[in-house]
């Protein structure tokens, strides 16, 4: 059964979801880089 043109599914706009995903990814990468650079292993006075 071939779909008619009027029955074609509209795509949802991806922009909002993509932005939220990028924000989450940025936050995770920031936390990972903080641990990687050893900020948490330094004495308490050097912590940001």
Curated annotation (Swiss-Prot):
Pfam families: Protamine_3. Testis. Transmembrane segments: none annotated. Residues 1-29 have a biased composition (Basic residues). Residues 1-48 are annotated as: Disordered. Keywords: Chromosome, Developmental protein, Differentiation, DNA condensation, DNA-binding, Nucleosome core, Nucleus, Spermatogenesis. One of its GO terms (molecular function) is DNA binding. Two isoforms exist, a major form and a minor form. This is the minor form. This is Sperm protamine R3 isoform 2. It comes from Hydrolagus colliei.
